[in-house]
Amino acid sequence: MSKEIAKKRIEELRDLLNTFNYQYHVLDNPSVSDAEYDRNMQELIKLEAENPEFMSEDSPSVRVGGTVLDIFEKVTHKSPMLSLGNAFNEGDLRDFDRRVRQGIDDANVRYICELKIDGLAVSLHYEKGRFIQGATRGDGVTGEDITQNLKTIKAIPLRLNEEVTLEARGEAYMPKRSFVKLNEEKEQNGEDVFANPRNAAAGSIRQLDPKIAAKRNLSMFVYGLANVEEKTIPSHSESLDFLGELGFKTNPNRRTCETIEEVIAYVEEWQEKRPHLDYEIDGIVIKVDDVALQESLGTTAKSPRWAIAYKFPAEEVVTRLTGIELSVGRTGVVTPTAELEPVRVAGTIVRRASLHNEDLIREKDIRIGDYVVVKKAGDIIPEVVNVIFDKRTGEEEEYHMPTHCPACESELVRLEEEVALRCINPTCPAQIREGLIHFVSRNAMNIDGLGERVITQLFDADYIRTFADLYSLTKEQLLQLERFGEKSATNLVQAIENSKENSLERLLFGLGIRHVGAKAARTFAEHFETMDALVKATEEELKAINEIGEKMAQSVVAYFDNEDVLELLQQFKEYGVNMTYKGIKIADLQNVESYFAGKTVVLTGKLEVMGRSEAKKKIEALGGKVTGSVSKSTDLVVAGEAAGSKLAQAEKHNVEVWNEERFLQELNK
């Protein structure tokens, strides 16, 4: 076959396969058999392999999955992906309607209602009609680049029907039938199953190997247009129509409503129809349809005033409580958990539910053998709502919390003003394991690839008992563990080695000193600069630091007044773990050349590691100016957790937005 004929045939096959994909995954109306589709795909793959010069990034063949990735790169969203306020009942919906009408002084409001897909929110970027990048929502400001995995989802067009530049947003999800099939395969292979379709979708999207994502049969509904060049669309409903014309899959069950009564009827209708869908929904999204009215209403500190998410009531089911098991946390708190006869709740099989503490068991008179009502709080965490007393036979057993720790048999205590029972034995194995999980977590030592499962493996193999033991681990030890190969073992050893260079505040937070969170750890690290200086500090010296109270000061002094802790710190030194503050102190910032010099910065939301007042001082010390509102003269918005209206203003004025992690990176350069 000549090059010219091969090129022509490749183009024909691409057009044909794109049409087949659109008919099957968007229109849900396939025109060919699976066998015919596969024959055409195999022919295309063969021709592209023989003629690599004709390969294209938007070829249907890329949907089978490409090169394995080492890591997901971070992506800053051009406009923040905001969350919505919630409504839980008819009264909340009527309050929303009243606020909308008061806000625009106009009785002629039209709403658009859409099913709230329970999946993973993603953004899709197209340049001149070609799909160039996809990202997760992340924290709303920064997500992860998952382009290669999204290319495997056949409901996402790789090339649009127009050469338009835009950003679309939607929800990637796993159909129920695909979820059932996937879990059956995992059970057959002896692997852990996914709890629900949402977790399965999220886990599939974040696979480093796109070929795995390609096998998971994910789909996607696009629900919004974030940015589009050279085009003004007057309503949300028209933007969805436009997205459909471009080749996107939009949910066909949306409806425009002229009154709040029609909205409520739509909500009630889909609450009944919900179980019959082949995908999970957890509510209804209601938006003011007119874009001009949306802009007029604006946003609050947390969410748009023109939209709300109605959350379906948590599904409640009855099952039998067969036992109560106990778990011990890293601080020694002993938490009771109900063991249940397996029951399906909100799409997943539930075998356990939280009982919180002994007082709740007494208050609800929960006994072993009782029939109980179980629901998922927010459709996520199972909990026991109440006992069905009419079903009691008299054979149920009252439960009494133990007097000794289930993990180490030390006597349990109840501290003053606490409802929880605690184990105060510092050598309790359950506390040590949970403490190790905290030590390696993201805000602490941030050791990549070392989570709860691996910590448990290492602990059960008796490889680790203290934080310092992590730094003596070898590749040979890791290779003895299940699911570890040469590459993963090498990567983990290197990640542990890299963590030795962390600044002091991460180590302090990782130690899990009672009352000392990430922010306080940073305050101590900056003030004392070295671990040795902090260890020697008196309670009075600690209390003299701004925002450090008596309880925290006493806790820190008591922690370091312990021979085992001092021995641990000595081991850290021997392994080469850094125990000095690597950040910049405010007093040292005056002569530093900085990005912030001459910049106007707005801080919004909750900053976890560094409080806003401290961040303000540092920016100002570096020559920047911190203001309380976003305008055209703003250079940067730093957004923490639960940031709201200022993000929308940043989008309006095209101002750059950073999350806290990016801010700290720049600050510590």
Swiss-Prot record:
UniProt keyword list: DNA damage, DNA repair, DNA replication, Ligase, Magnesium, Manganese, Metal-binding, NAD, Zinc
CDD domains reported in the protein's UniProt record: BRCT_DNA_ligase_like, LIGANc
Single GO MF annotation: DNA binding
Sequence positions that bind NAD(+): 34-38, 83-84, 114, 137, 171, 287, 311
Domain annotation BRCT: ranges: 591-669
Cofactor(s) of this protein: Mg(2+); Mn(2+)
GO biological process: DNA repair; DNA replication
Enzyme class: ligase
Catalytically driven reaction(s): NAD(+) + (deoxyribonucleotide)n-3'-hydroxyl + 5'-phospho-(deoxyribonucleotide)m = (deoxyribonucleotide)n+m + AMP + beta-nicotinamide D-nucleotide
A GO CC annotation given for this chain: cytosol
Enzyme Commission number, as recorded: 6.5.1.2
Function: DNA ligase that catalyzes the formation of phosphodiester linkages between 5'-phosphoryl and 3'-hydroxyl groups in double-stranded DNA using NAD as a coenzyme and as the energy source for the reaction. It is essential for DNA replication and repair of damaged DNA.
NCBIfam families reported in the protein's UniProt record: dnlj, PRK07956.1
Protein name: DNA ligase
Organism: Bacillus thuringiensis (strain Al Hakam)
